[in-house]
């Protein structure tokens, strides 16, 4: 089974077979907003000023035995990311996100690891995340990554209804 989550520049949509859904569904505004931030491939720190964010260094904090550098990033939309950087390579190893979803404050934690260099860019091949404090999180492991590969924009469009 394959889960699909897409955004075409205007609206988000998904197919969630693990939740028993086989047909594409349009996302709520909050879900699409969350998807946009999660899809920001360069992360919250690259070009943070141009993105309208502010960044504050908060010192170091232990992340699973690593004394990580902790940064507080306040996004243009008011969301807050706490970004934890590995002290040796300055790669993101954890991001804690605080945002409003459906009128309630939520906090999610994402751990990144198993970095590999692809065309001069480091990609995390392991991403594990979910609500902060929950032990059963969703884990994504990548087999392959390409940098700057050509992609047909139509693959992001909401699928047409199947003909009957």
Regions found by a protein language model. Name each.
Residues 1, 64-160:
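Gly/Pro-enriched, hydrophobic low-complexity segments
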Residues 1-37:
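An acidic-aromatic
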Residues 8, 18-19, 42, 51, ...:
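Feature targets compositionally biased, intrinsically disordered low-complexity regions
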Residues 16, 59, 146:
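Residues at the C-termini of beta-strands that transition into short coil/loop
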Residues 17-19, 28-35, 42-46, 85-91, ...:
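A broad, low-specificity signal for short, low-complexity segments enriched in glycine/proline
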Residues 20-22, 44-46, 74-79:
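Short acidic/polar alpha-helix capping motifs at helix-coil junctions
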Residues 34-72, 91-96:
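Short, conserved active-site entrance elements at the starts or edges of catalytic domains
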Residues 163-164:
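Short, solvent-exposed mixed-charge patches
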